């Protein structure tokens, strides 16, 4: 099987010749730049600096030689903009606090504050307040909350819609070119158009905007889902309309040349509980996901990707009814997320994309033998009758031992033959 055939087989809940593997196709299935550098050294690949394409989590680009060495079957397509609003182009070297030199966009602009922390600026505009902070001994950027005082009677949903706009012709062309490049790899393609996630808390503070208005504080947003529900409904309703208009234009440009679309990264689970009740999810979020995914399934062949960390078993039936085809990252370490239970209960109706290894404890802190054992067990559980794409539980974090990453890859290869 080709990589694409392998992925399409598992998405149709048929067992392929081996378990498909994804690393680097999305912002939630990626690898930290430091780990990519270590893997390149391990595999004896050409010496080159790693490109940090998403500074928020310091995720790096996996070049073709590394993808082949890792056995990657999925190719990502997205617009070349970062979470801090600047475009990836004209790469330049930059040294991280731990001394690792990487490549960043020419539009990447940072300063260092009195504490030694690194501040990053939206759209690379240093006349605007910084929107992200990397601690002096850190490995990625945290969003800086820039919440203006809230005057209740002046709240305007349009302020929280500033980032949801019609795609430009240049945006469409970026995606079209990306799709063409993905097709040439022979891998399955997953696309992220943007603007389709309702209430994604990573996006609420808008680190990509110079002067965000509306409700941008994380705690205030969660409070608003209860106390200002009409306000949130107005945002989601308009956002849904804009998203469908954008997807219509994208589909006109690329047709069914991609196999899946990243729809949503909104987290509904915590380690032990949830951010809202199922009732709140059904009332506030479900109608818009149902509408958006319904349009996708009616007008395209694209499969739909739902990311939600944490304990989300209680939401899975609603996710499925809302039109989601995949669940990621499948956080088996969270309460109620036992791998066998998930596969037995939902495995014929949803594809599990992730869950392959615990990135909180086992991958970063376990032994290679412990990594190997858990990967084989997860593959055995999740791959039965297809419906499984191997990935870690969320991104591979900084300081993860390369020997453990290699043990993980070796175990997947061993399982598949």
Task: List where the protein language model places each region.
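A contiguous, low-structure linker/loop signature
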Residues: 83-154
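Generic structural hydrophobic/aromatic packing signal, biased to beta-strands
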Residues: 21, 67, 75, 110, ...
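Residue-level detector of functionally special positions within alpha-helical transmembrane segments
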Residues: 2, 71, 96-99
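Short, charge-rich binding segments
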Residues: 65-69, 100-102, 178-184
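Short, glycine/charge-rich beta-strand/loop segments that flank catalytic centers
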Residues: 76-92, 193-199
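Active-site loop segments of alpha/beta catalytic cores
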Residues: 1-40, 45-52, 131-417
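Segments that shape or occlude catalytic/ligand-binding pockets
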Residues: 35-85
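Short secondary-structure boundary micro-motifs
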Residues: 5, 76, 92-95, 102-103, ...
